[in-house]
Amino acid sequence: MTLSKNSHKEDQLEEKVLVVNRCSKVVKGGRKFSFSALILVGDGKGRLGYGFAKANELTDAIRKGGEAARKNLITIESLEGDSIPHEVLVDQDGAQLLLKPAKPGTGIVAGSRIRLILEMAGVKNIVAKSLGSNNPMNQVKAAFKALLSLSSRKDVLTRRKVTHD
């Protein structure tokens, strides 16, 4: 029974390919190609993960990246309604990411990679700006760092030892 529940949860996850890179190595017989893939997995309800993998075949790199993403799932519980509770600015290596809450009806105003991450996280209204590096891996890490750093109003009041209504 438990196994079927877990497999049902896995079935709800949607997998998207963010980036595919092809590298070549010059050898005696010619060029040897290898591939790397950055994969995003999410259910649109706050569960999200990413994986990076390399392989000699593109399909193997995508499959391995998907497996890695499923192993690295996180849950974002601090989403309030369709947006985030507060503004956040995060640095990750050379990339900076600014996330701002938005009113209902705004939609996701962000670049393509960050937009995909936020859609798969289940955020509906947000404004995001990517600053600094446009390295895909650093942008993804910055987005995950930003989403994990969010705290709900209730959490903040509890930390400040203020009674909340």
Curated annotation (Swiss-Prot):
Pfam families: Ribosomal_S5, Ribosomal_S5_C. One of its GO terms (biological process) is translation. Residues 13-76 form the S5 DRBM domain. It comes from the Bacteria. InterPro entries: Ribosomal_Su5_D2-typ_SF, Ribosomal_uS5, Ribosomal_uS5_bac-type, Ribosomal_uS5_C, Ribosomal_uS5_N, Ribosomal_uS5_N_CS, Ribsml_uS5_D2-typ_fold_subgr. The keyword Ribonucleoprotein applies. Signal peptide: none annotated. GO terms for molecular function: rRNA binding; structural constituent of ribosome. Keywords: Ribonucleoprotein, Ribosomal protein, RNA-binding, rRNA-binding. With S4 and S12 plays an important role in translational accuracy. Located at the back of the 30S subunit body where it stabilizes the conformation of the head with respect to the body. The N-terminal domain interacts with the head of the 30S subunit; the C-terminal domain interacts with the body and contacts protein S4. The interaction surface between S4 and S5 is involved in control of translational fidelity. Part of the 30S ribosomal subunit. Contacts proteins S4 and S8. This is Small ribosomal subunit protein uS5. It comes from Chlamydia abortus (strain DSM 27085 / S26/3) (Chlamydophila abortus). The gene is rpsE.
